Regions:
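A conserved segment at the C-terminal end of the G1
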Residues: 170-186
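Helix-rich effector regions associated with P-loop NTPase G domains
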Residues: 13, 30, 36-53, 61-78, ...
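Charged helix-capping and loop-helix junction motifs
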Residues: 93-96, 124-125
């Protein structure tokens, strides 16, 4: 049988697709690799299942957009999470993420997380960095609930991808938005004030009347794949 679904996660060579009939685990046809196409979370696909129940992705439908890193497709908003305390904000990384948004018709939203434990100097520096950009800047706290209702309103009716350094609190925010997720939460290294990875793969969740995508934290973003002419 043939179905249409949306990739909600990919682990190794296996992809989980969400359909009106539930979830299916599929592999992608070899021709995608030959054509240099990699299925990513957010992709809408056609796939077939055999009598054994195993699925195979046969077509990736036209993408509205594609993020390089985090790898995701058909995104409406990119929630760029910065910490108001530790780890210190990586503005270079945030600016590269914003550049991806501008080139891909994605709305960037700046989330200043951990505002309940903010370092005032760090918080005000982050505000100053982006206050004249015209982008929405939302102070939030997964711990005391600051900004969570506004964040839910941002997600409603949209597909939102959360991105940023490790330990800035992406998974904590998602747990606050949808407590039933119970995503693992990382800790900050006492020695180097950097986060440890807890999210191992990107996953799309249907919550708050929309979709949100949790992604692994990272600190490097190579822009070499973007056409310099753009």
């Amino acid at each position: 049988m043939e179905y249409t679904g949306r990739i909600i996660k990919g682990v190794g060579s296996f992809y989980t697709l969400l359909t009106d009939n539930g979830e299916f685990v599929c592999k992608a046809r070899g021709r995608f690799r030959k054509e240099g196409i990699t299925p990513v979370p957010g992709d809408y696909c056609r796939f077939e299942t055999g009598d054994d129940g195993k699925g195979c992705i046969t077509e990736i439908l036209t993408r509205k957009n594609l993020l390089i890193r985090p790898a995701a497709a058909n995104i409406d908003k990119l929630m760029i999470v910065l910490s108001s305390s530790l780890p210190r904000p990586d503005y270079c990384l945030a600016d590269k993420l914003i550049m991806q948004c501008e080139l891909s018709d994605i709305t960037p939203v700046i989330l200043l997380n951990k505002c309940d434990e903010m370092d005032r100097e760090t918080y005000e520096a982050a505000l100053a960095q982006y206050k004249d950009t015209g982008y929405d800047i939302i102070p939030v706290s997964a711990r005391d609930g600051t900004g969570i209702d506004r964040l839910k309103a941002e997600i409603a009716g949209s597909t939102c991808c959360f991105a940023g350094q490790s330990a800035v609190g992406k998974s904590s925010l998602m747990n606050a938005l949808a407590p039933g997720l119970e995503l693992p939460v990382g800790q900050l290294s006492d020695k180097i004030d950097r986060g440890r990875h807890t999210t191992r793969h990107a996953q799309l969740w249907q919550v708050c009347g929309g979709c949100m995508l949790d992604t692994p934290g990272f600190s490097l973003l190579d822009m070499a794949e973007i056409d310099p002419a753009k």
